[in-house]
UniProtKB/Swiss-Prot annotation:
GO biological process per UniProt: iron ion transport
Classification lineage: Bacteria, Pseudomonadati, Campylobacterota, Epsilonproteobacteria, Campylobacterales
Function: Might be involved in Fe(2+) ion uptake.
Family statement drawn from the similarity comment of this UniProt entry: Belongs to the FeoA family.
Gene3D superfamilies per the UniProt record, alphabetical: 2.30.30.90
UniProt protein name: Putative Fe(2+) transport protein A
A single GO molecular function term of this UniProt record: transition metal ion binding
UniProt keyword annotation of Transport present: yes
Keywords tagged on the record: Ion transport, Iron, Iron transport, Transport
Species for this entry: Helicobacter pylori (strain ATCC 700392 / 26695)
Length: 76
């Protein structure tokens, strides 16, 4: 499941950053996004074009095409 498929206000864990280029991986790292991090989908725009995600007490905005590279699982 990718971050695009997440449900608002549920806690997820990022299990993989799949098939993206190095520039995007560096951008994710600059936001604190990496494998093992917990995240919560806070808001999204119409048609989920942009997503607002909480990661380590920081709110981050991601585009839909960026979120598709983040593989997540529901956190316990």
């Amino acid at each position: 499941m990718t971050l695009n498929e997440a449900i608002k206000d549920k806690v997820y864990e990022i299990v993989e950053i799949a098939n993206c280029d190095e520039a995007l991986k560096k951008r994710f790292l600059s936001f604190g996004i990496h494998e093992g991090v917990q995240c919560i989908l806070l808001h999204y725009s119409m048609k989920k074009a942009t997503l607002s995600v909480k990661i380590n007490r920081i709110q981050v905005a991601l585009r839909s095409h960026e979120a598709q590279y983040l593989v997540i699982k529901e956190s316990v």
